[in-house]
């Protein structure tokens, strides 16, 4: 049973992740997307490695399972971090938060196709239809998505989908320990991001503003490093089902913070779409919990 401190941590995690989108938008004013992703992962890797050392957990990044760790690092960290930075730089930050909330929906579809024990049922179908109807409704709002930026909205959704792909791949090594898997895949994402950042973006030639640099540091230290540690604490104390409730709150914080800090326009269609996405995710999560309790 979650106590008040557990709920506080869940809301804090949602607020931190929800705030990452407007900070990505500010950071992309001065930093290229691959470099932005690289810095985030560098700051995330430090507390993860220290955590494993403290808990005496062996980091298996270069063990015989290295192919799985490297593929997950590519699909679950390097690619989505980069795609989200590309997309968020050209659309409203709260729109990126809402589009990212499709991750559990696309993940449910992929789990039905690629796993044996997470098949579709009526509740999941209803949830997916409601959620994606909300996203499609967003694309009808020409104030928010138009011919100039719709491709970047699609890129953001693609980043979200890669998170789902990474989640499916992680099931292959789910018995390897949460801290080890996260740390090992983070190390591999660094291996992928470093050469591409150096070759394609030449970060030493950038002339970043103070605002962008502060946002980048926030993304690395708080929104990635600290957030992952909070996530581990929630997982270890309250379990996966409780931790996934954070997905309800992230788009809400994304919309509110985008409006407060960037003065982004919120239309009626945006609010309707937000409600639809949250309801859709509710149906999906309820169906999953019913499956768990019936096993």
Predicted regions and their residues:
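Specific transmembrane alpha-helical segments of multi-pass solute transporters/efflux pumps
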Residues: 16, 20-21, 49-100, 137, ...
